[in-house]
Regions:
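N-terminal Rossmann NAD(P)H-binding glycine-rich loop of SDR-like oxidoreductase domains
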Residues: 20, 28
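Rossmann-fold cofactor-recognition segment
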Residues: 55-74
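Conserved glycine-rich Rossmann-like NAD(P)H-binding loop of the short-chain dehydrogenase/reductase
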Residues: 35-50
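Catalytic loop of short-chain dehydrogenase/reductase
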Residues: 107, 113-127, 138-176, 191-194
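Conserved mid-core segment of classical short-chain dehydrogenase/reductases
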Residues: 98-113, 239
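Flexible N-terminal pre-Rossmann segment of NAD(P)-dependent oxidoreductases
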Residues: 1-16, 240-244
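A glycine-rich helix->loop->beta "capping" turn
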Residues: 59-62, 81-95, 101-102, 218-219
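C-terminal helical subdomain
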Residues: 172, 179-244
Length: 244
């Protein structure tokens, strides 16, 4: 049974790079439901229009789509500076950036494979973190979304495992460096049910846990979500940790 786990994030400014993706859609919907001001950068005006249409009635006045490249240090810095300037600050970031790659054994990959499946994605994640983390309000959180491939090897998709493992360590280092001044999380997912695939955890569950991370004051950590029951348990644990 699903428990009532609503959060009121009215006025909470959240940046969701990767928000137009299959997992990102669930995160965007959840934050909009919670009343947050949701900022989603996109590649083009066409992609913005397509995503707004996909969201339907959920795409209300609290959704802010921005055409902006955030895949470089300079691009991410400019994006965050614009948000801070025009929105008066930034409270949270949720980063469901990336996708799946299956291209062969490590001994068979090309330099282009290495660049696209590891270097470019890792660079994008670090670009956003280094730009946004210093600006986050104490009440918010920085959440990186990864998959189980971060903790187990996947033959034939090794670059995904390597890149995701790097993100796990990025979160741990950022949390250690931030101490109590900023909250930094990883959200580790099982197979996700989305508009593109079937799995054991829905994008709606992913979004609700991401909202709970931003909506509580639980300290930095890693949260696993593999099914609806685990999502409910995670939300309850975040609430309890915030009370401690």
């Amino acid at each position: 049974m699903t428990t009532v786990t609503t959060f009121d994030l009215t006025g909470h400014r959240v940046l969701i790079p990767g928000g137009t993706g299959a997992v990102g859609e669930g995160v965007v919907r959840a934050f909009l439901t919670a009343g947050a001001e949701v900022i989603v950068p996109t590649r083009s005006e066409g992609r913005s229009t397509e995503f707004r249409s996909l969201l339907g009635d959920a795409a209300d006045e609290h959704l802010h789509l921005i055409v902006h490249d955030y895949t470089t240090f300079a691009g991410a810095k400019d994006l965050v500076e614009q948000i801070v300037r025009f929105r008066g600050g930034l409270d949270s970031v949720v980063a469901p950036i990336g996708g799946w790659w299956q291209g062969g054994l490590l001994t068979e990959i090309s330099e282009d494979d290495w660049a696209s499946a590891f270097t470019e994605l890792a660079t994008t994640h670090l670009a956003i973190l280094r730009a946004a983390l210093p600006h986050l309000a104490a009440k918010g959180a920085y959440t990186v979304i990864v998959g189980d491939s971060a903790t187990r090897p996947v033959p034939g998709s090794g670059l995904v495992s390597m890149e995701q493992a790097a993100l796990l360590m990025m979160q741990r280092v950022a949390a250690a460096e931030s101490g109590e001044s900023r909250r930094v999380f990883t959200l580790v997912l099982g197979q996700v049910t989305s508009r593109l695939a079937e799995g054991t955890v829905t994008v709606g569950d992913v979004g609700r846990v991401a909202v709970a991370i931003s909506g509580t004051t639980a300290p930095s950590g890693s949260v696993g979500v593999h099914d609806a029951g685990e999502a409910e348990s995670a939300i309850a644990a975040l609430r309890e940790a915030a009370r401690a």
